[in-house]
């Protein structure tokens, strides 16, 4: 009986170590990035996302299919938070933390803010969407190897939120 219990504990220990190893391995290939920008009247924006690499793959339309909800990053769902009421794109957003999802298209993408945060990146629940809107996707001549978000503080207290990966760029103004 003691021998069986010891074997069970050893197997459980090995499984736990394997799961932590896999998690560490995947995170090292898509590192976590955190961004912060400040606008007017105490507006602060924070973004946290994991940055996958192209690795000689075709991204949009293949690895990330068109017209399918995407977690907009790797690993955990990307999050964005706002410290006060503001405009994200042309939509009003109340203060809070949201998960950021997208539906890529060749010419236009749907941007989604979802009220659920903290989930693994594939657990999307449409019933918890806070808002959706479309933005134009711009093709770039320069290839971006690793998914890159930027928060750029502009004049008149605007903040530009950009997404670049492969040869695609999205621009969402925030104020």
Place the predicted regions along the sequence by residue.
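Short, exposed beta-strand-loop hairpins at the edges of beta-sheets
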Residues: 158-166
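Edge beta-strands of extracellular beta-sandwich domains
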Residues: 171-175
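Hydrophobic membrane-insertion alpha-helices, especially the h-region
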Residues: 6-21
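Mid-length scaffold segments of soluble, non-membrane domains
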Residues: 72-118
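Structural motif
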Residues: 40-41, 88-89, 165
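Surface-exposed, gly/pro-biased binding rims or lids
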Residues: 118-158
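Short extracytoplasmic
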Residues: 39-66
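Aromatic-capped interface at the extracytoplasmic side
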Residues: 19-35
């Amino acid at each position: 009986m003691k021998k069986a219990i010891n074997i069970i504990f050893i197997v459980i220990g090995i499984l736990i170590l394997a799961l932590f190893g896999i998690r560490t391995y995947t995170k090292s290939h898509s590192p976590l990035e955190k961004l912060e920008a400040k606008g007017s009247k105490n507006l602060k924006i924070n973004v946290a996302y994991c940055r996958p690499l192209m690795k000689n793959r075709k991204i949009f339309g293949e690895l990330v299919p068109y017209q399918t909800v995407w977690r907009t990053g790797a690993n955990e769902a990307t999050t964005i938070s706002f410290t006060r009421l503001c405009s994200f794109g042309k939509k009003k957003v109340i203060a809070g933390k949201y998960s950021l999802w997208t539906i890529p298209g060749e010419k236009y993408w749907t941007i989604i803010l979802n009220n659920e945060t903290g989930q693994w990146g594939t657990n999307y629940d449409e019933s918890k969407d806070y808002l959706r809107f479309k933005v134009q996707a711009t093709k770039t001549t320069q290839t971006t190897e690793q998914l890159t978000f930027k928060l750029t503080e502009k004049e008149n207290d605007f903040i530009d939120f950009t997404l670049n990966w492969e040869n695609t760029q999205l621009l969402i103004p925030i104020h």
